[in-house]
């Protein structure tokens, strides 16, 4: 619409002439096949003319109407739009002024359901938290018991190694009397083979 305001205004007259048969055919005469309608007086900055693009339907059997002048007393066509109608705004349904009993009951039921679901979820999380804490305590106790058992095994191994070394020292010592036999009893000698 802004580009049409920059064009030169034409008076509201009908120019006689023949319409072009095709869009590619250019008019060589000075007359144009456009019809501009509008008041003859000064305008208020709005374009009042109408240009219809396209090919005119014309046959030889149709009589050519006499060109007539448009009456100047016709006011221009003005389209007024509602200022509330703007593009890009989302239409939302209007809220009902009074809610019915069914809607109130549904809202109460929905509130109770939301509360029950929230309570159930929080209860599940609380129980799961307690179970995890109990399992963590049991795991810590099992780790402490395992560490204590491993320490006891290390101590017992060290004691057994020390005892084995002492037994080796005692068994390897030649200074001590032979404690295997009873004193005074000589072991019997096996007589040799008889002939």
Curated annotation (Swiss-Prot):
- Report the disease annotation for this entry: Defects in Bloc1s3 are the cause of the reduced pigmentation (rp) mutation phenotype, a mouse model for human Hermansky-Pudlak syndrome (HPS). Rp mice are characterized by abnormal melanosomes and display altered expression levels of the proteins of the BLOC-1 complex.
Keywords (alphabetical) are: Albinism, Cytoplasm, Hermansky-Pudlak syndrome, Phosphoprotein
The record's tissue-specificity note reads: Ubiquitously expressed.
Per UniProt, subunit arrangement is:
Octamer composed of one copy each BLOC1S1, BLOC1S2, BLOC1S3, BLOC1S4, BLOC1S5, BLOC1S6, DTNBP1/BLOC1S7 and SNAPIN/BLOC1S8. Interacts directly with BLOC1S2. Component of the biogenesis of lysosome-related organelles complex 1 (BLOC-1) composed of BLOC1S1, BLOC1S2, BLOC1S3, BLOC1S4, BLOC1S5, BLOC1S6, DTNBP1/BLOC1S7 and SNAPIN/BLOC1S8. The BLOC-1 complex associates with the AP-3 protein complex and membrane protein cargos. Interacts with BLOC1S4, BLOC1S5 and BLOC1S6.
Note one Pfam family from the annotation.
BLOC1S3
Region ranges (Disordered) = 1-72
- This chain's source organism reads Mus musculus
In its UniProt entry, what is this protein called?
Biogenesis of lysosome-related organelles complex 1 subunit 3
């Amino acid at each position: 619409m802004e580009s049409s305001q920059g064009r030169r205004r034409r008076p509201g007259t009908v120019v006689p002439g023949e319409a072009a048969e095709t869009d590619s055919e250019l008019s060589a005469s000075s007359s144009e096949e456009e019809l501009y309608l509008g008041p003859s007086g000064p305008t208020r900055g709005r374009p009042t003319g109408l240009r219809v693009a396209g090919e005119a339907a014309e046959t030889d059997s149709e009589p050519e109407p006499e060109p007539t002048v448009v009456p100047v007393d016709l006011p221009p066509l003005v389209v007024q739009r509602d200022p509330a109608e703007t593009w890009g705004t989302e239409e939302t349904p209007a809220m009902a002024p009074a809610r019915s009993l069914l809607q109130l009951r549904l809202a109460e039921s929905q509130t109770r359901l939301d509360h029950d679901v929230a309570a159930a979820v929080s209860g599940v999380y609380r129980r799961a938290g307690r179970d995890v804490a109990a399992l963590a305590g049991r795991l810590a106790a099992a780790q402490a018991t395992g560490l204590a058992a491993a320490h006891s095994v290390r101590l017992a191994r060290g004691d057994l190694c020390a005892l084995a070394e002492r037994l080796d020292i005692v068994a390897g010592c030649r200074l001590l009397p032979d404690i295997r036999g009873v004193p005074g009893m000589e072991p019997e000698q096996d007589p040799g083979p008889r002939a």
